[in-house]
Design a protein with these regions (language model features):
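N-terminal secretory signal peptides that target proteins for export/translocation
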Residues: 1-14
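Lipid interaction determinants
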Residues: 10-12, 29-128
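Bacterial N-terminal signal peptides
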Residues: 16-27
Length: 128
């Protein structure tokens, strides 16, 4: 009984060590999100790409337009870069979404838009 208990502790320690090792190795990769603060950097990322997530596909063009679809409805809008933030107006079908300036980050694969100048909710999009 005691031997089984000690074997269980050894298994937990091995698992714990592997778990900690994984996060020590993976954390620089996970933490490599960069804030995009300049319009040309943003434009270079989205040029000729679609921003996609479940049921959403958008194009953001360098002439300040947003076009695409979300949940079966057309999406259209305008955007500009103001004081380091992506600021947009947006129509989703017949519904107007309020004007919002968003912080944008990039992790090497996905763009993340954080509403209310980085203080609100976020949505991540794959670039394809």
């Amino acid at each position: 009984m005691i031997l089984r208990h000690l074997e269980g502790i050894g298994t937990i320690k091995k698992f714990g060590f592997k778990f900690v090792l994984f996060f020590l190795i993976a954390s620089p990769i996970i933490a490599s999100e960069t804030t995009i603060s300049e319009r040309p950097d943003f434009e270079n990322l989205v040029k000729d790409k679609k921003l996609e997530r479940f049921l959403i596909s958008l194009s953001v063009t360098d002439d300040g337009k947003i076009e695409g679809s979300a949940a079966g409805r057309d999406v259209s809008g305008d955007w500009n870069w103001i004081d380091g933030y992506f600021c947009r107006t947006l129509m989703w079908g017949e519904r107007e979404l309020k004007y919002n300036c968003q912080k944008v980050t990039f992790d090497g694969r996905r763009l993340r838009f954080i509403s209310d100048r980085g203080a609100g909710q976020s949505a991540s999009f794959a670039l394809r």
